[in-house]
Every structure is written in structure tokens, then in C-alpha cells.
Regions:
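Glycine-rich FAD pyrophosphate-binding loop
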Residues: 37-57
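Beta1/beta-strand and adjacent pyrophosphate-binding region of the FAD-binding site
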Residues: 14-26
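Flavin (FAD/FMN) cofactor-binding and adjacent substrate-gating region
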Residues: 107-190, 195, 205-210, 215, ...
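Rossmann-like nucleotide/phosphate-binding core characteristic of flavoprotein oxidoreductases
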Residues: 153, 162, 394, 398, ...
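Flavin (primarily FAD) binding-site architecture
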Residues: 236-250
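Dinucleotide-binding Rossmann-like beta1-alpha1 core, especially the glycine-rich loop
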Residues: 61-155, 284, 422-434, 551-552
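Core beta-strand elements of the Rossmann-like FAD/NAD(P) dinucleotide-binding domain
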Residues: 16-18, 222-233
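C-terminal catalytic lobe of FAD-dependent flavoproteins
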Residues: 186, 247, 252-261, 265-270, ...
């Protein structure tokens, strides 16, 4: 599967000299690329998967100060609150307030002494939040409010009634995928080249050991040759993979990778967030996010496969135990899936995982005899811009560039103009308006450009996904402009298939759009479909038990066999051979279906209103 959309085509970068090559397409890599590109540097980003595929897309989705860091990492709290304020100014369309209720649980006991201890516990909690209030203005946060037991239960009747009272806390939620993507888009619009699904196969070195570039290979194009990219500075921002990447160049540094697991619910449990505590004292959150709710995160040292971290049933039970203590009715809600990330936490010996610093550092490997290579470690989503500024300033200094950083003031794509959701929706049928309002949240002022396609083809206003309202115009525009190469890439940019259906309703139609826009073959389309279904099951597996697990496994089999994906694989391969390499999986009314021929006795699956059809596409594939 080849690249498309300029910024993903490695042929445009082959043999080209850059000022800086950034390895890693997470929030740190995208932030560094944006900062360097806006200073006029020629930048290339190399990411072996998709943007935000790792920890950057697997966090709690908040740009917060981190109240728990007040006890042992005050500088991180202040820095995160400061950068949160900048992010709010440069990307207001991506943000939403999350009002938190922090319950103070009543300890076991009775008598006068216990009454005194209860009062001390309440007073101590309020003093703690008064300290956090000092930093709230930096991120436009509201000061805390102390609630009585009755006031807290009136706000959220689902709370455990065994509370002394509660304290409120104001935080900001964000779509982390969009934050990464919009940093990357801005970098591209300032001249950067972004190569997703490209893997570094080696470092290019001079006779003095200086790093002068990297060799990369396209992971999606069969038979792709290795391409050489050159630059005097290479930044290793590959997160938890960082030490492994540095070792390829003969350099080294240490991290303490931390595994974080979240549980996702497809519906809102409450409109408030809650601070919850694990049995071991770890603080987590139960909070509304987008159209659903999430609970997490765990924090455990991780020694496993960085490419395939998995949530376990024990981790799910640990999270639910903590949630149940504050919100006893949690078991009444159906869990949708889990997601997992591995943090590139700074290495420290003899500290519990949740006490590790969330500070960031970057290392110059010249002292190890590997000049030209800089490695980035640590950091938080809320402080990514500060990290990027520090690294980019060092890169610019080495290259003699004196242009100042502008990322704290320059708006991200979508924040440049007014957002007139009501105006955009007035000419659309009511059933499509929710999708447009959600589009405005993801794309801001640039939604207007996406909606121009609806003027030419009103059918593009139709929703392709009902769980997470997404219209066809957004899907096509995303493929054309946002470094999309695979079906799962669309998921990260639009949240399509992140809802309750997990892609069951929308994956086939979306894959057809990807085929049309990205010039896929039918076999590639089917590979994308199966990959999306596999990813869906991996996320759902840890939250399923007993009969639910058996039912889901049956659903997987029915989706693959009943939906004709198995026979369609064989049909597509044969038809592609007959049609010079091109065939398509089409969806439409049976009367509109293109002509087909039988392969293995099964060509298409018909329902009452639709048909899935494999058909050759005339002409050679470009």
C-alpha cells in the first residue's frame, strides 16, 4: 500500500537533505516538528506506525496540572498548568471542561475521637486543594469548593453515601489524537515532510562517528527499497522505544517504562469526574470524555513487548475495585473496551511507579561518541509544548538559527478563524447536524472547508458512523489532508468506530471510502478491514467474562464468515488477478450493484437493502 497526500510519500524525501530529522510521531515528536518548522528549519518526521499510535493516544485525555504531583513534584504541576494555558489559547476548539468531585470517604470507626479525625480529614483535604488553587489561574481553572455530604450527593446521587463531604476540582479534557495530528499538520504546512508507517533500519554516520541521517523503509509498500535521509541533527523522540532507537546508533540512556490501562464506557456514567483510589493508594480518575466515560490509569513497571502491550483481566478488576468504592453502581454499566499505553518515564531507582517524576529531559549523546543525536525522555501531554520548545531551541542553536519560538501564540490548524456551527448546519437535514457539531470540535474553523464537499455532493453529509457521529465529508477530507494511510488511522483522527459498535456498523463503508481516496486494491481493503476487527477484539477481550466472551468470539466469527470476509479474500485475489491488479469491495442497493462473477460459489452478501459486492475495476492501477 503506497503513500498518498504529499507528506506521506517517502519518494519526496529520498536523497533529500534536511536540517533535522525527528524520529517519532507522538505528541513530543509532532510538537518538536512544528516548532522547528515554524522557525524555518527543514524538517522530516519518521514514525514507524501512525501519529499518536503509542502513549500519546493512550492517556487520560486531560491537559491538567496533576494534583497528585503537588506532594513530590511541584515543578511539574506548575509547568503543566502553564503549558495548559498556552494549549487552551492555541487550540480552544479541542478543549472541554471536566468538573471533578473529589469525595472524602468516611473511615471506619465511631466515637468522639473518630469525629475529630473526620474533621481533620476534611480540613486536610481542603488545605491540599487550596495549594492547587495557586496554579489554577495559569490554566483558567476555577478554584475549589468544599461540599457537604448532602451537597455532593445532590450533585451526583450515584456517589457512595458513606462520605464525609467532597471538594470540587476544575480540569480540562482534550482529544489527544487531534492535538498530535494538528501539530503535525501545522508542521507540514510550514514545509515539513511526515512519513508514517516508515521504520528506521539504521543510522547514517560519518567517519568521525557523527550521526548524519537515517535509513528508512516503508512498512506498507511491498518490496519497498530502503531510502536514505540526511540531516546534521537527528532527534530521537520515540518514547518508550527511545533506548532501543538510541542503541541502533551506538548510544544509550535509561527509562522506566510505565504501563497504563484505561477502561472505556460507550455512554456517560456521570457528567462529573471523580478522583478514585486504588487498593494500593494509586490515584485514578472516573470521568466523562467525549460521548462516553473512561476510568484509569494504572501505573506499573513494564518489561514486556512495547509493540503489543495488552490489558489483563486483573488490571480491569483492580480499576473496578477502586471505582466501586466511590461509585457503587459502576457494575450496572457495560464496559466497551480497554486501551493501553507505555509511558517513557524518567529512570529512578527505589521509587514506587506512581511516585516517579513526570519531568522531561533530553540527552546529547556526543559524550558517548555519537554527536548529532539528541534523545528525549519523560514528559506529560500537558507540557509537550514546553518540551518541544526546549529541544527545538537547542536544535536551532546548533544550526545557527536565531528565530524565536512561536508555538505558544500561533494557533493550531482549526483555531485560526471563527467557528459558526449554527451557520454551517442551517442548510443540512436535522439528522446530520450532530455529525457537523462533532466535526467542528475536531476540526474547528477548518470544518467549513470539509463541508464544501457537501455542496457538490449532498450524500457526503450522511453519517458513516452512528455511535461517534462522523459524516462522509469528514472521512474523505481527513484522508486527503491528514496523513492517513490505513483504516485505523481514520479512527484516530475522527473517533469513528470508537463507540459502542467498535466499527461493526461503519468499518466496511469507511474502508470503501479509503479504497476510493487512497487507490487501494481489494486485497488491501480486506486486510485493513480484518486489521480493524482484530484491534477491536484486542481492546474488548479484557472486559469480557463467561458468556459475554463466548458471545463476542461468536460475533467475531460471524462478522468474518457471515459477512463473507473469508470468501471475499479469495474472491478479491482472483478478481484482482483478472483485472490487472484492481478490484473493489462495494456497498450499495442490490439493483445498483456492479456486474460480478462467482468465485468459490460466493461473491456477495445481500441484506434487505444493501449488498457487499466484489467487482473488478477496469484499467491498470497507476
Amino acid at each position: 500500500m503506497g503513500g498518498h497526500g504529499g507528506s506521506t510519500d517517502s519518494s519526496t524525501a529520498s536523497g533529500t537533505d534536511f536540517d533535522v530529522i525527528v524520529l517519532g510521531g507522538g505528541i513530543n515528536g509532532a510538537g518538536i516538528a512544528r516548532d522547528c518548522a515554524r522557525r524555518g528549519l527543514k524538517v522530516c518526521v519518521v514514525e514507524k506506525n501512525d501519529l499518536a499510535k503509542g502513549a500519546s493516544g493512550a492517556n487520560t485525555g486531560m491537559i491538567h496540572g496533576g494534583i497528585r504531583y503537588l506532594m513530590y513534584d511541584v515543578h511539574t504541576t506548575k509547568m503543566s498548568c502553564t503549558d495548559s494555558g498556552y494549549i487552551q489559547r492555541i487550540a480552544p476548539h479541542l478543549l472541554f471542561r471536566v468538573p471533578f468531585i473529589v469525595p472524602v470517604m468516611k473511615p471506619q470507626g465511631a466515637g468522639l475521637l473518630q469525629t475529630m479525625m473526620d474533621r481533620l480529614l476534611l480540613e486536610g483535604s481542603e488545605v491540599f486543594f487550596e495549594a492547587y488553587d495557586v496554579y489554577q489561574p495559569l490554566k483558567r481553572g476555577k478554584p475549589h469548593t468544599r461540599l457537604t455530604r448532602d451537597e455532593a450527593l445532590a450533585l451526583e446521587p450515584g456517589l457512595n453515601p458513606n462520605i464525609l463531604g467532597a471538594v470540587t476540582m476544575d480540569e480540562w479534557g482534550i482529544d489527544p489524537f487531534r492535538l498530535v495530528v494538528e501539530n503535525a499538520i501545522d508542521a507540514v504546512e510550514h514545509g515539513a515532510v511526515i512519513l508514517t508507517w516508515h521504520e528506521v533500519t539504521g543510522f547514517v554516520k560519518g567517519s568521525d562517528g557523527r550521526v548524519e541521517g537515517v535509513d528508512v523503509q516503508d512498512r506498507l509498500t511491498a518490496g519497498a527499497t530502503t531510502r536514505r535521509l540526511r540531516a546534521p541533527v537527528v532527534v530521537n523522540a520515540t518514547g518508550a522505544w527511545g533506548p532501543r532507537t538510541a542503541a541502533m546508533a551506538g548510544a544509550s540512556y535509561q527509562l522506566r517504562p510505565g504501563k497504563g490501562v484505561h477502561i472505556v464506557y460507550s455512554h456517560r456514567i456521570s457528567n462529573y469526574g471523580f478522583a478514585i483510589t486504588g487498593v494500593d493508594g494509586r490515584q485514578m480518575f472516573l470521568m466523562p470524555h467525549e460521548n462516553g466515560s473512561i476510568i484509569g490509569t494504572t501505573d506499573d513497571d513494564y518489561y514486556g513487548d512495547l509493540d503489543h502491550p495488552r490489558a489483563t483481566e486483573d488490571e480491569v478488576k483492580y480499576i473496578l475495585q477502586a471505582a466501586r468504592d466511590v461509585f457503587p453502581g459502576i457494575d450496572q454499566y457495560r464496559m466497551s473496551r480497554t486501551y493501553v499505553g507505555v509511558r517513557p518515564t524518567l529512570f529512578t531507582w527505589a521509587k514506587n511507579e506512581d511516585r516517579l517524576s513526570r519531568e522531561h529531559e533530553f540527552y546529547d549523546h556526543e559524550a558517548q561518541g555519537v554527536p548529532g543525536l539528541i534523545s528525549v525522555a519523560g514528559g506529560k501531554l500537558a507540557a509537550y509544548r514546553q518540551l518541544a520548545e526546549e529541544v527545538s531551541t537547542e536544535v536551532a542553536r546548533r544550526l545557527g538559527n536565531t528565530v524565536a519560538c512561536s508555538t505558544h501564540a500561533a494557533p493550531l490548524p482549526g483555531a485560526e478563524g471563527p467557528i459558526d456551527v449554527d451557520g454551517w448546519m442551517k442548510d443540512l437535514p436535522k439528522r446530520h447536524r450532530l455529525a457537523v457539531s462533532r466535526m467542528a470540535y475536531r476540526h474547528g474553523s477548518r470544518s467549513q472547508a470539509l463541508l464544501k464537499a457537501v455542496d457538490d455532493d449532498p450524500r457526503q453529509a450522511c453519517e458513516t458512523c452512528l455511535c461517534e457521529p462522523v459524516c462522509e465529508a469528514e472521512i474523505r477530507g481527513t484522508i486527503q489532508t491528514e496523513v492517513v494511510r490505513r483504516l485505523v488511522d481514520i479512527r484516530r483522527r475522527t473517533r469513528q468506530s470508537m463507540g459502542a459498535c467498535g466499527g461493526t456498523r461503519c468499518a466496511v463503508r469507511t474502508s470503501q471510502i479509503l479504497l476510493e481516496e487512497a487507490n487501494l486494491t481489494a486485497v488491501e481493503q480486506l486486510v485493513e478491514l480484518q486489521g480493524a476487527m482484530d484491534a477491536r477484539f484486542i481492546g474488548k477481550r479484557p472486559v469480557l467474562e463467561g458468556a459475554n466472551l463466548a458471545t463476542e468470539e461468536l460475533n467475531q466469527a460471524m462478522h468474518f464468515l457471515g459477512g463473507n470476509l473469508g470468501p471475499l479474500f479469495r474472491a478479491a485475489r482472483l478478481l484482482a488477478d483478472d483485472a490487472g491488479g484492481r478490484a473493489a469491495i462495494g456497498i450499495g442497493a442490490p439493483a445498483d450493484a456492479p456486474a460480478t462473477r462467482d468465485v468459490d460459489g460466493i461473491v456477495h452478501h445481500r441484506t434487505q437493502a444493501t449488498a457487499i459486492v466484489v467487482a473488478p475495476i477496469p484499467g491498470d492501477r497507476p
